[in-house]
Amino acid sequence: MRKFLKTIIKGTLFCLLLLAASLTVCLAAGLVKLPDTGEQVCEVPAVRVIEPLPSEAAEQEEQAGQLDTPEQEETSEQENVSEQEAPSEQEEFSEQEPVTLLFGGDLFLTDLLQSKYRQQGISAAASEGLLSILRGADLLMLNQEFPFGTTGDPMEEKQYTFRVDPGYVSVLTDLGVDIVTLANNHMLDFGRGPLTETLAALDGAGIAHVGAGENLEEAKALKTFEIGGKTIGFLGASRVIPEYSWNASADGSGLFTTYDAKALVEQIRKAEEGCDFTVVYVHWGIERSTQPEEYQRTLARQYIDAGADAVIGSHPHVLQGIEYYQGKPIFYSLGNFIFSNGSYETMLAELTLEGDRIGIRLIPCVSEANQMRLLGESACPAFYQSLESLSPGIAIDGDGRVSAWQPGAAGVQENVPGAVPAE
């Protein structure tokens, strides 16, 4: 019993000593106030303060400044939003990366090409070296000078009427085609049925199209691509159709035409509002003529004055000259791409967009028995010289890069902005 009492007394003394030590700590920390009544009151803080570990101290110190007044919190939120919206250096750089647009002329898939394609694949249409260029561009555009279809009857009293089975749309995808213009003088050779089949075939293959549609709104519609931080817009129209009835209407299928420039000019002005670069592809001119008609020059200038950044032409089936107007390039005719069974020289036009500059490079080609390949290096100087003779005020260097050099020639200005070949 005595032993038990000693144990209780010792325990009580230990608790009193522990309580005294705790009060001393509270006084030192300022957690205990001594009111005038002389009674000691211990105020417990609403939030218990725990000293961080050394490894956590720096992180908590950094966060402390962010947990301030409501105004400071609002400012922090705004700063955080700004930081999220502001592009990183990597994003800014990617927005300035060059964009390569590649353009070819008239495309038709002859019976001979179709036969070879079934046996050899896409090598029947283009050489390996050319294919790498076609597929390597950010975007490839051609004039599709035929409808895909199996229905309809050929137009009476028309010398040449074209139609290709929709299954051969794979030729275009194999070539790397991204967009075609359908505004030309062969799209309704077999009536409006094949036009509907054409739109379906291209849509199914993921190939964009301009210049024709199920109604006028579709035919004149702008098609855009987002490439390298730029919005690139495309419009297509024809100045060559066999009959007025080929025109699209409010409720009828057909083509978008530009005999009167007003409608296309209006579309260009609308495109300028949302596009960084606008291309107008026009079917015009006289077949087999290497010189543009005066109306081609007039229309091209109207398009550029309205906001077009480049004008591409087709229909003559031969090359016509190049011109700069207000610093913007005009290719009056890119001739044939892959079109006939014969042998002929032609070219692709490569536009490189870098900032506000347009670098232009010509890629000479030769087509033989429907297969297109790069022109031999030894033949290129004569090719460039021939094209220069069709292009007053234009210089073409040994690599096919184009620049304007003669002040005042054909609307060309000295030191034309944008007429700077890519390095």
Can you name each region flagged by the protein language model?
Residues 11, 15-59, 68-71, 77-79, ...:
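Acidic, metal/ion-coordinating pockets
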Residues 1-12:
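N-terminal Lys/Arg-rich, disordered targeting/topogenic segments
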